[in-house]
C-alpha cells in the first residue's frame, strides 16, 4: 500500500494464514482516520483473487504527514526501496476460504494480527532506528508498546542476580518508563541502564504484583568449587589458616569468647550488649612451638540475623557451637545445628558459663544428644569442651583442638593465585564511599587489583587488615576491609580479582550472562482477594536507612515477623548511608516514618524534619527498633475486644424525646450498665449494635439497673425502637 509515495503495507505469508503487516508505524495514527474500499475482481475459474485497498485521507492528516516526511529523508529512501506499486498492493489468495477470511477480521487497524512474533517487531525497530537515528523515538515507543500489549505480565519471576532497569522491563513486559516513575515516587532516581539490587527488584515485584523468587547463583560459586578441587591436588600450595565460625543463641557468650581469645573488650562496646554484624578476626596462636593463625567469624545470635549466620556457615571450615551451661539448647542453637548438618561441617561444642551457679553440663549434653550430637565421653563423635569465656577456663584447650582438627583436614591454598573469596558485609562511608568487609579464601589480594562479583566490577584503592592497619596485600584465609568501589557490593557474593581491566571486563561479561538465567512461573490463581484484603487495611509506611546491608536484611526480616491483623506494614525503600533531606521530603509526601539504624542525619535533614513535622526515629539496637514498631502498630490499631454477656432486656414502650425516641425496657436477667455494649434483635434479625448513651429512671441518670427493674434507654445513634424488641447486654473486655 502506498500513501504520499511511501510504502506502509507489504505482503506477509505465514503457515497459518495470510495477513497484512504494517512496516511503518506512521500508519498507526493515519489508519484509524482513513476510509478504504475493498473490491474484488474475478478473472477466471482458476484465477487468483485480488484484494485492492485504496487509501483516502483528509487534508489535515495529509499536511501532518507531509510535515513529518520533510524530516525523514532516510525513512523515505528505505520506504521507496520496498515499494512495488504506486497506488495499491495486491494480496494473493489461493482459495475462496482464504479470501473470505479477510472479511471476518476487524475493519480497522486490528487487521494487523496480534500474534506477530516479538522478534519480527524487534527487527522492524532496528530497521527504523538505523534509518532515522534520533528523529523517530515515537515510532520506536509505539513498536515497543505492541510487544508489551501482546505479552502477559508474569505472576512470578525467578532471578539469581541483580538486573538493570531495562532488563527488568523486558523480562516483565512492563514499560521502563513506568518502572522509572515508580522508583522515582519511592525517592530513587534511576536510568534505564542502572543496576537494581535484589531488594529493589523485590519491592518492584510487590508494586506490580509479581512474586519475585531468588535462586542460588551458579557462576562464581562453580568457579570456586572447581578451584577448590584443583587446590587439593595441586603441588604449588601452602597451608592456610582454618576459618572458624562461632554460632549459638543470643547472649550465650560468643563475642565474650572471642574477646578472651583476642584479649579485647568488643562485647562491652557493643550496643545493647549484642552482636549485630558479622565480624572477622585473625588470631595468632602458639601451637607445637610454632606460630599458627586462626580466622574467627563472630555472628549475631538474634533471630533477625539468620542471613548473616548463613553467610558465616558458607565460608567456614570448622564451627564452634556455643551453648550456655545455665540456659541450655535454645531456638537459635537448634537453627545452628540444622545448618551445620546441612553443610556437613566439622563441629566443636563449647559449653560456656560453667562458672555460673546454675550451670548444668550434663543437662546440656542430654539436650544436645536429642539432635544427634553425642559427646565423645559417651562414646559419640562430637568433641565437647566445658569453658568459661569470662574466666578464660579451657580456652587454650579449645584452640588446640581447632588446630588439631585443621591439621587433620589439611586446609590448603595457592598463594600466587589472583585472589578469590567472599563479601562478608558492606556499607557506605561518608569519606571513602562504598566499603566491603571481605574474606580472601585463595590467592593474594593486592592494592590496585580489579575485583569482580556477580553484579559489579571495581578497582581496590585501599585496604585494612582485621586490626584496622593499612596494608597492600591480603593472603589466603585473611579477613580485611577494602574501598574505592563505585557501588556497594552484595553481602554473601563470591568475588574474583584480576590484575588488568581487560580480563576483568571479559570475566564480568561472562558472569553477567551466567547470572541472567531466569525462569517464569505464571500463577493461575487470581490474587484479587489478597489485594482487596490488603487494600482494606491501614498502612504504616517506613523509610529505612542503615549502616550496613546486613542490618537492612536483619531489620526487614524482623519486621516481616511482626503479626498484625488491622495494619499493613510497608517499607517504601531501604538504603545504606545517612538520612538525607530527600529522605525526609519523601517521607512527608508518603506520610512515612524514617527509621535510622546505626547511622547519622545529614546536615539539614533534622531541620527539614522539624519544618515538615516528620518523625525520625534513631536506633542502635535491633530489639529497640522492633519494640518501637510494635508500639506504633498498637497506637494505630483499633483495640480488639471479646464480648461477655451480662444481661438481657425487652422493650415495653417507646417514648418521644425531641427528635429521637427513648425505649422503656425491663431487665429480664442480669443487669444493664452505662458502659455496656448492646445488640437489638427482632424477628427479622439484628437491627442495631452499639454503645449506650444514657440510662434513666424517671428523669434521673443512673449507671446500673439490675434484674426485674424498669428504666429508660436512650441511644444517640438509634431511635427506631419497636415494642417487643429484645436487647442483649454485653461487657467488652479488651484482648
Swiss-Prot record:
One of its GO terms (cellular component) is cytosol. Residues 248-255 are annotated as: G1. Residues 273-277 are annotated as: G2. Residues 298-301 are annotated as: G3. GO terms for molecular function: GTP binding; GTPase activity; translation initiation factor activity. CDD domains: IF2_eIF5B, IF2_mtIF2_II, mtIF2_IVc. GTP binds at residues 248-255, 298-302, 352-355. The keyword Chloroplast applies. PROSITE patterns: G_TR_2. Residues 352-355 are annotated as: G4. Keywords: Chloroplast, GTP-binding, Initiation factor, Nucleotide-binding, Plastid, Protein biosynthesis. Residues 388-390 are annotated as: G5. Residues 239-411 form the tr-type G domain. It is found in: Plastid, Chloroplast. NCBIfam families: IF-2, small_GTP. Belongs to the TRAFAC class translation factor GTPase superfamily. Classic translation factor GTPase family. IF-2 subfamily. One of the essential components for the initiation of protein synthesis. Protects formylmethionyl-tRNA from spontaneous hydrolysis and promotes its binding to the 30S ribosomal subunits. Also involved in the hydrolysis of GTP during the formation of the 70S ribosomal complex. PANTHER family: TR-TYPE G DOMAIN-CONTAINING PROTEIN (PTHR43381:SF5), TRANSLATION INITIATION FACTOR IF-2-RELATED (PTHR43381). This is Translation initiation factor IF-2, chloroplastic.
Amino acid at each position: 500500500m502506498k500513501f504520499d509515495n511511501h510504502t506502509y503495507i507489504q505482503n506477509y505469508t505465514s503457515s497459518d494464514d495470510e495477513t497484512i503487516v504494517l512496516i511503518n508505524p506512521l500508519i498507526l495514527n493515519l489508519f484509524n482516520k482513513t476510509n478504504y474500499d475493498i473490491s474484488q475482481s474475478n478473472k477466471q475459474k482458476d484465477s487468483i483473487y485480488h484484494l485492492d485497498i485504496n487509501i483516502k485521507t483528509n487534508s489535515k492528516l495529509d499536511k501532518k504527514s507531509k510535515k513529518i516526511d520533510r524530516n525523514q529523508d532516510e525513512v523515505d529512501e528505505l520506504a521507496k526501496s520496498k515499494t512495488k506499486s504506486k497506488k495499491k498492493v495486491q494480496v494473493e489468495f489461493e482459495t475462496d476460504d482464504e479470501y473470505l477470511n479477510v472479511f471476518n477480521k476487524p475493519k480497522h487497524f486490528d487487521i494487523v494480527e496480534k500474534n506477530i512474533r516479538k522478534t519480527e517487531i524487534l527487527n522492524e525497530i532496528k530497521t527504523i532506528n538505523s534509518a532515522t537515528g534520533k528523529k523517530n523515538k515515537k515510532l520506536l515507543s509505539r513498536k515497543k508498546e505492541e510487544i508489551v500489549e501482546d505479552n502477559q505480565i508474569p505472576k512470578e519471576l525467578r532471578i539469581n542476580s541483580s538486573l538493570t532497569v531495562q532488563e527488568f522491563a523486558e523480562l516483565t513486559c512492563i514499560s521502563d518508563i513506568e518502572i522509572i516513575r515508580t522508583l522515582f515516587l519511592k525517592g530513587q532516581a534511576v536510568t534505564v541502564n542502572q543496576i537494581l539490587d535484589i531488594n529493589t527488584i523485590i519491592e518492584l515485584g510487590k508494586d506490580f504484583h509479581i512474586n519475585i523468587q531468588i535462586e542460588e547463583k551458579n557462576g562464581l560459586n562453580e568457579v570456586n568449587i572447581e578451584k577448590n578441587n584443583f587446590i587439593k591436588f595441586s603441588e604449588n600450595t601452602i597451608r592456610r589458616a582454618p576459618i572458624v565460625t562461632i554460632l549459638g543463641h543470643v547472649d550465650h557468650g560468643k563475642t565474650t569468647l572471642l574477646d578472651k581469645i583476642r584479649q579485647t573488650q568488643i562485647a562491652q562496646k557493643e550496643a545493647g550488649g549484642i552482636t549485630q554484624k558479622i565480624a572477622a578476626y585473625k588470631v595468632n596462636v602458639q601451637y607445637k612451638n610454632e606460630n599458627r593463625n586462626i580466622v574467627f567469624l563472630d555472628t549475631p545470635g538474634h533471630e533477625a540475623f539468620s542471613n548473616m549466620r548463613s553467610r558465616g556457615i558458607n565460608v567456614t571450615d570448622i564451627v564452634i557451637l556455643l551453648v550456655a551451661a545455665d540456659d541450655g539448647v535454645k531456638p537459635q542453637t537448634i537453627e545452628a545445628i540444622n545448618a551445620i548438618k546441612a553443610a556437613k561441617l566439622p563441629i566443636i561444642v563449647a559449653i560456656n558459663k560453667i562458672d555460673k551457679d546454675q550451670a548444668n553440663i550434663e543437662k546440656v549434653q542430654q539436650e544436645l544428644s536429642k539432635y544427634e550430637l553425642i559427646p565423645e565421653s559417651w562414646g559419640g563423635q562430637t568433641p565437647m569442651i566445658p569453658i568459661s569465656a569470662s574466666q578464660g577456663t579451657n580456652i587454650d584447650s579449645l584452640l588446640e583442638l581447632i588446630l588439631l582438627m585443621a591439621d587433620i583436614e589439611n586446609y590448603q591454598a595457592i598463594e600466587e593465585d589472583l585472589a578469590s573469596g567472599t563479601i562478608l558485609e558492606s556499607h557506605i562511608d561518608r569519606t571513602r564511599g562504598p566499603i566491603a568487609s571481605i574474606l580472601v579464601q585463595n590467592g593474594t589480594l593486592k592494592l590496585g587489583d580489579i575485583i569482580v562479583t556477580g553484579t559489579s566490577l571495581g578497582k581496590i584503592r585501599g585496604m585494612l587488615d582485621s586490626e584496622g592497619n593499612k596494608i597492600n596485600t591480603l593472603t589466603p584465609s585473611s579477613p580485611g576491609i577494602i574501598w574505592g568501589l563505585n557501588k556497594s557490593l552484595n553481602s554473601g557474593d563470591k568475588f574474583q580479582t584480576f590484575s588488568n581491566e581487560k580480563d576483568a571486563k571479559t570475566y564480568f561479561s561472562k558472569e553477567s550472562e551466567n547470572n541472567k538465567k531466569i525462569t517464569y512461573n505464571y500463577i493461575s490463581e487470581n490474587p484479587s482477594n489478597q489485594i482487596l484484603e490488603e487494600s482494606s487495611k491501614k498502612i504504616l509506611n517506613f523509610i529505612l536507612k542503615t549502616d550496613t546491608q546486613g542490618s537492612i536484611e536483619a531489620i526487614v526480616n524482623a519486621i516481616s515477623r511482626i503479626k498484625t491483623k488491622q495494619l499493613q506494614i510497608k517499607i517504601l525503600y531501604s538504603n545504606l548511608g545517612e538520612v538525607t533531606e530527600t529522605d525526609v521530603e519523601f517521607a512527608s509526601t508518603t506520610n512515612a516514618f524514617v527509621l535510622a539504624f546505626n547511622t547519622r542525619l545529614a546536615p539539614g535533614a533534622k531541620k527539614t524534619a522539624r519544618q515538615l513535622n516528620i518523625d525520625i526515629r534513631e536506633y542502635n539496637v535491633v530489639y529497640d527498633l522492633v519494640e518501637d514498631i510494635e508500639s506504633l502498630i498498637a497506637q494505630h490499631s483499633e483495640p480488639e475486644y471479646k464480648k461477655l454477656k451480662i444481661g438481657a432486656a425487652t422493650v415495653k414502650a417507646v417514648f418521644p424525646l425531641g427528635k429521637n425516641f427513648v425505649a422503656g425496657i425491663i431487665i429480664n436477667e442480669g443487669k444493664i450498665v452505662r458502659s455496656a455494649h448492646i445488640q437489638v434483635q427482632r424477628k427479622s434479625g439484628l437491627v442495631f449494635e452499639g454503645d449506650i448513651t444514657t440510662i434513666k429512671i424517671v428523669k434521673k441518670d443512673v449507671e446500673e439497673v439490675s434484674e426485674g427493674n424498669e428504666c429508660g434507654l436512650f441511644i444517640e445513634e438509634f431511635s427506631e425502637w419497636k415494642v417487643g424488641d429484645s436487647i442483649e447486654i454485653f461487657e467488652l473486655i479488651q484482648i
